[in-house]
Regions:
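Feature marks short, highly hydrophobic, charge-poor N-terminal signal-anchor/signal peptide-like helices
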Residues: 1-10
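Transmembrane-cytosolic junction motif
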Residues: 15-38
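Charged, low-complexity intrinsically disordered regions
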Residues: 30-46, 50-52, 57-225
Length: 225
């Protein structure tokens, strides 16, 4: 009985590995098709430099064994864009956990202090890593549904203006959107991210969400510097 059990166990492991490989290959092909549609370059291989280049962004400096993959890069609607799947791990041995998610970066023409906007609940996981309090707003609904943190409150209020607040609230009210959208701004990067890898057909719609967020940043943030 034991040899049969062992053989069955090995077969199950092989099936899981093969299924994982096929799934990764299909995603790679689908992401390549998205890149072609958007007129962007596509690099499927692991990119550890990306993690080092943007390690000032909170979500990209967590854990260990950090790398980007399925990287789309290029210009979209006049903005320099990076889109990629991302991985990091925490713990070791039996307590090892792997995290995979989608990340979008738009290059800004000026440098800014750190600002993080996350749906309430998601931010609690990283609250201890950020040494400043949640910022409150006149919109009680926005303050209930989002955590906003920055060492520069004036900058946070400038970014979270009335139009931005309404847009973000509409995103959590709409079931068709990914409601786990998080926003980070620091240095010259405007980033949005999610808690998992988006389906390839969700990449373009969420790239357009990134462009919308950029359009809601007040012009004076760039002209007065």
């Amino acid at each position: 009985m034991e040899p049969l059990f062992f053989i069955g166990f090995v077969v199950i492991i092989i099936v899981i590995l093969v299924a994982g490989y096929i799934s990764s290959l299909k995603r790679r092909e689908a992401m390549a098709a998205v890149a072609a549609k958007l007129g962007m370059q596509f690099m499927p291989n692991k990119d550890r430099y990306m993690a080092r280049r943007y390690n000032f962004l909170d979500k990209l400096r967590r854990g260990s064994n950090r790398y980007a993959y399925n990287v789309l890069s290029g210009t979209y609607q006049g903005h320099e864009i990076l889109i990629f799947d991302y991985h990091y791990k925490t713990g070791s041995g039996k307590n090892t956990h792997h995290y995979y998610f989608s990340f979008f970066i738009l290059q800004l023409p000026a440098s800014f202090p750190e600002l993080i906007i996350c749906p309430e609940g998601i931010f609690s996981k990283i609250a201890q890593a950020v040494g400043y309090d949640d910022i409150d707003f006149e919109s009680h609904e926005f303050s209930r549904k989002f955590c906003v943190r920055s060492p520069n409150k004036k900058f946070a209020y400038d970014v979270c203006n009335a139009r931005m607040i309404e847009y973000l609230l509409s995103s959590v009210r709409s079931p068709k959107d990914n409601t786990d959208l998080s926003i980070e701004i620091e240095e010259r990067a405007l980033a949005i991210s999610f808690n998992s890898c988006l389906a390839p057909d969700k990449i373009e719609p969420n790239l357009n969400r990134l462009i919308t967020v950029r359009s809601l940043l007040p012009d004076y943030l760039f002209t007065r510097r």
